[in-house]
Amino acid sequence: MKKNKLELVYLRAFICVIIIVTHLLTQITLENEQMSDSSLILQYYIRNIFIFGTPSFIILSQLLTTLNYESVTINYLFSRFKYIFIPYLLIGLFYSYSESLITASSFKKQFIENVVLGQWYGYFIIIIMQFFVLSYIIYKINFRLFNSKILLLLAFIVQQSYLHYFLNNDTFHQFMTHYYPLSENTMILGWIFYFFLGGYIGYNYEKILSFLEKYLIIVIMLTLGAYVLFIAVSGSDYWNVTSFTYTLTLYNSVMFFLLLGVCMHFKTMLLNTIKAISAFSFFIYLLHPIILDSLFAYTNIFEDNTIVFLAISLLMILGICIGVGMMLREFYIFRFVIGKQPYKLQFDQYQPNWN
């Protein structure tokens, strides 16, 4: 396995922050059901700017696999079961127990609905686990399939077709929800393009970095164009914001390239903080929604100043999650809760100049 590249450390940290911002903006919307139509529409388009976080994690996950491995064994799957799926189950157990207390419902009901069926924010892990299996199968067939532009195009067509019919065809929607047992968001056909895009980027990583270094302005223009296209084709349900839609596939994809291109230019900025966020990103993803409601009860006093609200909320969420994670890291057994990346975390030693 190759050494992690610094731009990917920044990228993973920024994607983690983007997901938190998405949830904070959603919290504002949900807590203000009486807002005016103009405010709702404005928030809808702002929230969609940041909605690329989940697709980006899927792209990044497969990018790292394809970049770092030219062959995989069964240990590839076993390692991800231990350090990704088991933490999913353990955090899910805690979440289900707390929800059973809040809603006065049975723990069994909460666990089955949320953790087993994926009807909670952690559904993303079910998607990732399916893609780990698919990645293993593709590696066993031919690693070079990740370099296929035809396969990438087919994946795009499959994803767009599936999402279009699922969201617009009642018969197809009812068929899928009836026969597919898990949460609708966990169906990998709705994410399959992001998986192959990540594989393609990882396979051609240096070429893509070279392109981004030379032509980042083109990516910026494509990003703006993709978002304008989304505005043109988006519907009128301004309450529902999701990345599980065909209208945002192009925007989500180009935003990943843009963020990667930007991260190439960071070398030392907040490096220790970025390393901590990146190392604990998986744990942050699973833990922060549990504490979000309680924190919002305090931070919503800054709601009229969105920038202040986001800054204070981010500081508190990251501080709590990383702080808890650092304490758990003292005990190796908690790798089954926080994952294995925090145990690889090493801070740079430097002496700040206060003069």
Curated annotation (Swiss-Prot):
GO terms for biological process: enterobacterial common antigen biosynthetic process. Keywords: Cell membrane, Membrane, Transmembrane, Transmembrane helix, Transport. Its main location: membrane. GO terms for molecular function: O-acetyltransferase activity. It is a multi-pass membrane protein. The keyword Cell membrane applies. Disruption phenotype: Complete loss of the intercellular adhesion phenotype. Belongs to the acyltransferase 3 family. This is Probable poly-beta-1,6-N-acetyl-D-glucosamine export protein.
